[in-house]
Amino acid sequence: FWQLTNSPKGVSNFAPYFHPSEKFIIFSSNLHAPNSFNFELYKIDIDGKNLQRITYSNGFNSFAMFSEDGKKLIWTSNRNGKTRRDFNIFVADFLEIQSSN
């Protein structure tokens, strides 16, 4: 086994899920807002490179999974909720954007 993330103090990474291609995973993190409960979805290659933020909702986004063909992403979020504890399930087309490195 190997470690993919090495986050600073106050950052939590959890709920990883493999893309069907097994080239990368999606997971939930508060990397952008350490010590907060603001969790967004991130994507990282299996070698630990190319970290990319996927969601931007200033709330809680987690428990992401892909459809078998990898074209749909499903996750839990409190976006559009009346309170921070109102969670719903969201589905979106997953479009992989190549980095310009």
Residues of each region from the PLM?
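Sequence signature of WD/YWTD-type beta-propeller architectures
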Residues: 1-101
